[in-house]
């Protein structure tokens, strides 16, 4: 099955407040240093019928605002790796935020009970 998805916007979300200077370099633990690299692509799906009273633009704005505030507390996630030093430069570079839309229903009534 082919899924048609329209990308509405792509942007970088940065922490809502800058990382303090004394926390700019985050040293990785020994376990983090020996673990193989991996990536968790995350896609969140929302049933638009549950958000009838909230416009899509407003919903996206709230998600971006929440993400920016979260990155303030989890500042290494918004940084870049320094491979030769086994650390993260907590430079507030930010994370990717992609907003998209699809006319397809992702979870049908048959599969919905499995996800609840």
Predicted regions and their residues:
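Non-catalytic N-terminal regions of enzymes
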Residues: 1-116
């Amino acid at each position: 099955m082919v899924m048609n998805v329209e990308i509405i916007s792509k942007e970088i979300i940065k922490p809502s407040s800058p990382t303090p200077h004394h926390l700019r370099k985050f040293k990785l633990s020994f376990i983090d240093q020996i673990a193989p690299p991996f990536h968790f692509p995350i896609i969140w799906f929302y049933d638009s019928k549950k958000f009838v009273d909230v416009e899509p633009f407003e919903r996206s704005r709230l998600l971006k605002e929440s993400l920016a505030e979260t990155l303030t507390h989890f500042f290494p996630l918004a940084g870049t790796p320094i491979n030769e030093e086994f650390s993260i430069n907590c430079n507030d570079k930010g994370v990717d935020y992609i907003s998209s839309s699809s006319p397809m229903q992702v979870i049908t009534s048959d599969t919905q009970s499995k996800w609840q």
